[in-house]
Amino acid sequence: MAVTPLVDLSTRKLWRALGRPIDPAGEHAWLRAPTSTSAVVRDGWLAAEAAVHGGTVDETTSGAGLLASLDLLDGPGFRARDVAPQVRDFYEHTSAWGVEVWSGWSPWAWPGGELISRFFGKRVEQLALPMRPLDVAQGMDSRVSVIRDAAGRQVAAGWLRTLRATGDYVFSGCYSARRLPGAARASVHVAFPLESGNLQVFLRPEVLPDGSFRLVSPPGRFGADGAYVVAADGGRTYAARVPVHESFHLYVDDRGVLRTDHVLRLWGATAMRLHYKLEPAR
C-alpha cells in the first residue's frame, strides 16, 4: 500500500479515537455534510451533494451567491437589513466580486502550517493555506456553483478557489445557512469535504453599529458554533470538536472599498491573519 493512503487512513483512525460516534442521518443531522470519495478533493463532491437533495449543480447563474439571501440568518440579535449593502451584495452575488488576498503567519504557527500545506493541503487540493505572500501574488480565481434541490431552490453553494498561476485548488467549500440544535437563529455553515469526512465550521453572524458584518466561530460545547472534524471509519461516523477559532470582519473602508479581516486562532493564540480586498468584477 502507498504511503499517502496509509497516512490518510491513520488520520481517520485518530479522529475516530478523539471523537464521538454520531448519527448524521438522525440525531446529528446538523453535521451531515459533503465528503469526497477520492483523496484529491477539487470539485468532485458537487454532483453527489446535489443528488442528496434530489437536485442539480447550477454553473450558469450569473451573480450566484454563497447564500440565496442574507435574510436566512435573521433571528433574535441579528437583522440582515442592518448590514451594509456592499456586504450583503457580496454574500448574495459572490461570483460578481473579485478577491485579492494577503496572508501572514505568526512565527510559532508557521512550521506547522507549512507541514500541513505541503504534505496535506497541496496533495489533496483542499485547505491548502497560502504560506507566503508570493503564493497568491498572481491572485486567486473563484467559482460559485449553486446546489439546487428538486424544486430549483438554492440549498447550498460550492465556493471553489484556485491559484491563478497554477490552477491548483486552495479551498473547496460548501456554504449554507444552518441552525444548530436549540439555536434561535441560523449560523453560516461551511463544510470542506475530505476523503471519507470533512472539516465543518459554524460561524455566528453579528452586525455592528456601522453596518459591518462579523462571523465568529468561538470556543464552546459540542453542538454550539465552532469547528468540527467528521470522519467515517469502519461503517460508523465520528465527530470531534476542534480548537480552531475564526473571525471574519467585513467592512467598507473610508474610500468605499469592501474589505475583510480574517483571523485564525488555535485555542486562544493567533496563528494566521488574512486580509481580503473585495471589488465588483461586473
Protein language model features and the residues they cover:
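Cationic, amphipathic, low-complexity segments that mediate targeting or membrane/lipid association
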Residues: 2-9, 13
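Soluble ligand-binding/transfer domains with enclosed cavities or grooves
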Residues: 18-275, 279
